[in-house]
């Protein structure tokens, strides 16, 4: 079996080492590598990846973009995929984020930094967990407003949107904070 992780940048990913060791220890005949795809080359490159790999993980900045290229198994408004196998797209981010929190009380409001696929997964879990108030910060307000609109239409909770510059003010009143952005990743800001 041939597997990989796609994203940009992706050279910092520990996934190839982790999965390589796991496959070795479990006696699984599989390989796992990192494939860096430039955002401008995504449409051409994703076809090649789908043809040459049995499955792949998806990281920034492609978790939302990949949906148009696979058979999506995610329910709206999650609209982000982090795993593709046999050309079917799945999202395990929300479970990975939420499982450790199931036994705990989540204090509100929850501040989320970022408005990409990871933020969608966090909001998806928080909504299922009964959280009523989310404060969403992003550098591009239109992306945050889109998420607000898509999730609030389902009812049961409120998302307030703030520019990234409001981070200190919003953090001062937030009881829980989640960084779902690329900020701090590998010591770089990625967009």
Task: Provide a role label for each language-model segment.
Residues 1-104:
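Phosphate/diphosphate ligand-binding glycine-rich loop within oxidoreductases
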Residues 33, 134-135:
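Conserved beta-strand positions in the Rossmann-like core of class I SAM-dependent methyltransferases
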Residues 157-191:
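Rossmann-like adenosine-cofactor binding region
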Residues 7, 93-94, 101, 107-131, ...:
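Glycine-rich adenosine-cofactor-binding loop
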Residues 54, 132, 157:
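Short acidic/polar active-site loop segments enriched in Thr and Asp
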């Amino acid at each position: 079996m041939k597997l990989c992780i796609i994203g940009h940048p992706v050279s910092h990913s520990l996934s190839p080492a982790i999965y390589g060791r796991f496959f070795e220890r479990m006696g699984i005949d599989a390989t796992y590598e990192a494939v860096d795809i430039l955002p401008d080359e995504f449409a051409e490159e994703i076809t090649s990846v789908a043809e040459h790999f049995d499955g792949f993980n998806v990281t920034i900045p492609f978790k939302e973009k990949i949906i148009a290229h696979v058979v999506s198994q995610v329910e709206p408004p999650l609209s982000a995929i982090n795993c593709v196998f046999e050309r079917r797209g799945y999202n395990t981010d929300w479970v990975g984020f939420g499982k450790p929190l199931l036994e705990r009380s989540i204090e509100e409001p929850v501040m989320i930094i970022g408005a990409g696929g990871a933020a969608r997964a966090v909001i998806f879990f928080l909504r299922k967990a009964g959280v009523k108030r989310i404060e969403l910060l992003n550098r591009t307000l239109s992306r945050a407003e889109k998420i607000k609109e898509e999730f609030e239409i389902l009812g049961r909770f409120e998302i307030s949107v703030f520019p990234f510059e409001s981070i200190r003010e919003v953090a001062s009143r937030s009881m829980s904070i989640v960084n779902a952005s690329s900020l701090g990743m590998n010591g770089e800001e990625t967009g």
